[in-house]
Amino acid sequence: MNCTICRYFSLFISIVALLALSAVSASAQLGGLSGVTDKLKKKTPDFLAGKPPITTSLPDAKWGDASKDGFTPRDPQRSLMTLQRTPNGGFVLQPGYYMMQTQSYCLKAGTHGPGGGDGYLYAPPKGPAEDAVMSIVRNSVQHPEIQQHDIQLLLWAIIARAKFEDLQAQLKATAMKLLTPRQLAALNRSALDALSGNALTDALGGVPEPLRQIAQAEAQLRQMLTTPGASFAEMERVAVLSGAAPPGEGSQEIPSGRWSMHPDGYYVRYIPSGYSSTRVEIWVPQGSPAVGKEYDPATHIAVPGNTARQRLIQSGRPQQAQ
């Protein structure tokens, strides 16, 4: 069965890649990071050239509302699961105060998990792989049989730019359920070669922290995701750093539980319990323009005030029964 999956996977990857090749934008393959990254590009072109698959960062989280710090709506709290669902795995909003303990996912390998009282703000997904990332999270709602760990591994494969055609058979099968052939072909084209040992050390020579730490984690994940026998726990230790998180460059003091005012007119806040589970609270005031609009969790990245911590994309899958 695994061999059959591999043959079909390789076949449609090859066909779709040929069809889509002419549509690839040159600008998506070129370019580079500014500042110190440009200076290092000759040393580590594969690691640093071009945009990361997901670029969402703290400057994109522009909707925090400090005036609502300490505020709790008077409405009785209800489960988001009581609202009408959408084909995207989202929810049709109605006036009221809602909560859901959701499955959330790490989008920044080589950084620290939630903790230390740091707050999180709303920002939308941005970057070359935003479409694929949102598709995985949205489509996972219709596939409850897929384990959260496997969804996280697919997202790490995208972030680390692993070759999807080289993934373990089970992950390939999962990818085929959640992504289109065109999306898979695009991800395969943007993949990087796996490096380890002295080759990895040489490639990272001269790269400063924290860029080195992130690039090293991504390189290790690329190798592990395509190596039979690598366990989820081993990959998690690479992607999610333990210990106290120092303040990252450009960090802001954001208290835990700060509300963000979504552009659609509702308030949202995120309170993570580790990277894989987040308490999402939504308040839709009476008369809000958000009434009747969709809350699509896949369009929500919870961005920490401490840039050394992980960005967490939300999902419409409950972590536990609501």
In which residue ranges do the predicted regions lie?
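Bacterial N-terminal signal peptides that target proteins for export
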Residues: 2-13
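Mature extracellular/secreted ectodomains of secretory-pathway proteins
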Residues: 97-228
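Extended, helix-rich scaffolding/adaptor regions
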Residues: 32-36
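Short, surface-exposed polybasic-aromatic patches that bind anionic ligands, especially phosphate groups
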Residues: 37-157, 254, 275, 284-313
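Long, low-hydrophobicity ectodomains and other hydrophilic envelope-associated domains
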Residues: 73-74, 81, 91-93, 99-101, ...
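Bacterial N-terminal signal peptides
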Residues: 11-22
